[in-house]
Amino acid sequence: MEKTICELFAGVGGFRLGFDRLNTGWRTTWFSQWEPGASKQWAHDCYVKHFGECTDLNGELHTGDDISTVNKDAIPSHTLLVGGFPCQDYSVAHTLASSKGIEGKKGVLWWQIRDILIAKNAPFCIFENVDRLLKSPASQRGRDFGIILSCLNDLDYSVEWRVVNAAIYGAAQRRRRTFIFAYKNSTEYGQKMNDEDSTQLITRTGLMARAFPVRDAVKLRTTSLPKDVVETSDSFAFLFDNAGYMHKGVIYTTPVNEIEEEPILLGEILEHGAAESFYITDDKRMAKWIYLKGAKKIQRKSASGHEYTFSEGPIAFPDPWDRPGRTMLTSESTLNRSTHVVTDPGTGKLRTLTPVEAERLQGFDDNWTN
């Protein structure tokens, strides 16, 4: 089997860098990275700087285009489709033209993934999403993940999933993400796993269990997907646990407890000294930081006129050196509650993270995004 990869929503190349570091012969044949509404495609340009461009089967360059406009048949063939896609509204309806066709909401990237799977028939897939995917939407818990499973089931994939806190497995960031591994039932791996006991697959023998070791399952629960994706969208609700497996429309899920590894601590990634612009030197800004990081209760009124109390607990200020970093958001370094504020090891003064520290927190090499 040829070890080829297609990388969607590639960002600055995290998936590709991870496979390259494994040094096991995987080769990326095509990628896609496009940021809607941006005048400059910084992430795409960073990716190309490190890895170069990829042409499609027509010899054309479309890696920086909106994936919804890309000819899926022209994407080079690949063994593994990977990508981190956002948690969006996955609800669907029957198309007007056909009661068997389905139509998702415009702009929802899952449907682009599905179209590529139909066009290219990749034997294996690895996807990443936020941890709340398993519980969304609030009005119909589990529906969105059920739709994804239903789509994959219709295309003859079985699926393993796990919610992973990166810091528990040795990374520098307490970042919880849902990882999804799907494989065609006709593959050698699929035929082998289809004979496995579901609990053993989730906790011992499956890819997720071997990559992210856990202790024994707590309690296995099962349910079945509705007959089609539209019915799943309309009526399916289920409380997914942090680990599970789906085969032929039957879902098996259980809470699992991770076997922890030694994490990288925030203090280990900090530089000694930084440019003056990173330091908090203004008294008014310092007061704002203290307010944002502190506990608070605020009376608010909803659009409908309902009054309620908004409350939130405190965040450590500054962030402690002896723990992994918190989840880093795209708003990192701006004046907001989620931004890391650290005591500089060299100066003893409070400041935000430098670009190099942010790269280290995400597992990239220093100056990767320069």
Name these PLM-found stretches:
Residues 1-124, 130-146, 150-153:
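Core alpha/beta nucleotide-donor-binding catalytic domains of modification enzymes
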Residues 16-17, 88-92, 133-136, 170-173, ...:
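Short catalytic/ligand-binding loop motif for oxyanion handling, primarily in non-cytosolic enzymes
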Residues 64, 131, 156-168:
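Conserved S-adenosyl-L-methionine
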Residues 82, 161-163, 179-181, 327:
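Conserved hydrophobic/aromatic beta-strand scaffold that supports enzyme active sites
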Residues 120-123, 157, 176, 336:
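A short helix->loop->beta-strand "cap" motif at the edges of active sites that frequently abuts
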Residues 148, 160, 174-178, 324, ...:
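Residues that flank catalytic or metal-binding motifs in active/ligand-binding sites
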Residues 171-250:
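Flexible, glycine-/basic-rich loop-and-beta segments that form/coincide
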Residues 247-370:
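C-terminal target-recognition/interaction regions appended to catalytic cores
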